[in-house]
């Protein structure tokens, strides 16, 4: 098994200068298996798991859950990269390879949902980093999270690039019987070279679209978010047409599709010069 060769380290061992301040009490796991070599996971016990989104934001939701910080999907344009600097890590390589795992997320959520002050409001997931990144295959936090939401009949939505969502089909179906469940898969383009250049850790776009169709085949409402559309890279008529055709090929198996635009961030802007060389 690919997870059998992990190494368990104490954050108190080794060079303390390399351990972020927040991780002094974390369990640190590293891997020497293909696909995970160079990755570091910081297992922490979070104090809370449901975050409030300020009303001043233009988001359509007010509550979110993010069981991970950092993301192996390594999308170069990701707006959440800057949040890694708050943990004394960088927004580039560290964001892709040093992931914080909130191992007590399901337990915290159950407590929140049972608290007298909770009004059963909609909770959005996948809004910051992908909750179905590869680490989820090991930690399985989403199964506990979905089960908690199901048991409380609390409405929720998930946005992901991860085909691993199909693993939780059984729980999603059970949740959909008692509450509103909204699912979206992100796939803005189908160009293979572009995908490998700017979304190197994600499943292929075609696989994501197929995962969306499979969810619909099983009675769950799932749409494709054609986003983010990356300026100068995936916004040409040819690129957009190819993506629409791929989605349309699934026919009635896709409930809906809507576009979204990537907005420039400091890391996004700096990386664009590299993309020009990669894709030339």
Task: Cite the ranges covered by each PLM segment.
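Short catalytic/ligand-binding loop motif for oxyanion handling, primarily in non-cytosolic enzymes
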Residues: 87, 132-133, 233, 263-265
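Active-site glycine- and acidic-residue-rich loops that bind
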Residues: 163-166, 230-241
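Conserved Radical SAM active-site core
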Residues: 32-69, 76-184, 188-196, 205-213
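Non-catalytic positions within long, well-ordered alpha-helices that form the structural scaffold/packing
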Residues: 150, 216, 245-248
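Conserved strand-turn element in the central/C-terminal portion of the radical SAM core barrel
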Residues: 190-192, 199-201, 214-236, 259-262
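Short hydrophobic alpha-helical runs that function as membrane-insertion/retention elements
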Residues: 157, 223, 255-257
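A structural motif
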Residues: 153-154, 220, 251-252
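Auxiliary Fe-S-binding modules of radical SAM enzymes
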Residues: 1-45, 51, 235-280
């Amino acid at each position: 098994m690919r997870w059998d060769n992990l190494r368990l380290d104490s954050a108190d061992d080794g060079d303390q200068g390399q351990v972020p301040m927040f991780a002094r009490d974390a369990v640190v796991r590293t891997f020497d298996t293909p696909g995970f070599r160079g990755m570091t996971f910081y297992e922490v016990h979070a104090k809370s798991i449901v975050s409030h989104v300020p009303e001043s934001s233009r988001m359509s939701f007010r509550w979110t859950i993010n069981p991970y910080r950092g993301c192996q999907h390594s999308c170069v344009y990701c707006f959440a990269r800057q949040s890694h600097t708050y943990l004394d890590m960088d927004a580039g390589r560290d964001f892709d390879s040093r992931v914080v795992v909130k191992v007590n997320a399901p337990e915290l959520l159950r407590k929140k949902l049972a608290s007298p002050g909770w009004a059963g409001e909609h909770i959005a997931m996948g809004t910051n980093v992908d909750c179905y990144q590869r680490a989820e295959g090991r930690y399985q936090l989403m199964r506990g999270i979905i089960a908690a939401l199901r048991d409380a009949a609390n409405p929720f939505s998930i946005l992901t690039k991860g085909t691993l969502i199909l693993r939780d089909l059984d729980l999603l179906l059970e949740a959909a019987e008692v509450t509103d469940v909204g699912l979206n898969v992100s796939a803005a383009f189908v160009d293979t070279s572009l995908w490998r250049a700017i979304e190197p850790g994600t499943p292929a776009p075609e696989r994501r679209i197929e995962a969306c169709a499979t969810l619909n085949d099983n009675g769950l409402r799932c749409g494709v978010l054609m986003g983010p559309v990356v300026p100068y890279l995936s916004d040409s008529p040819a690129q957009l047409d190819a993506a629409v055709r791929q989605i349309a090929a699934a026919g009635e198996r896709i409930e809906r599709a809507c576009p979204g635009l990537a907005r420039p961030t400091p890391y996004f802007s700096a990386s664009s010069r590299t993309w020009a060389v990669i894709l030339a």
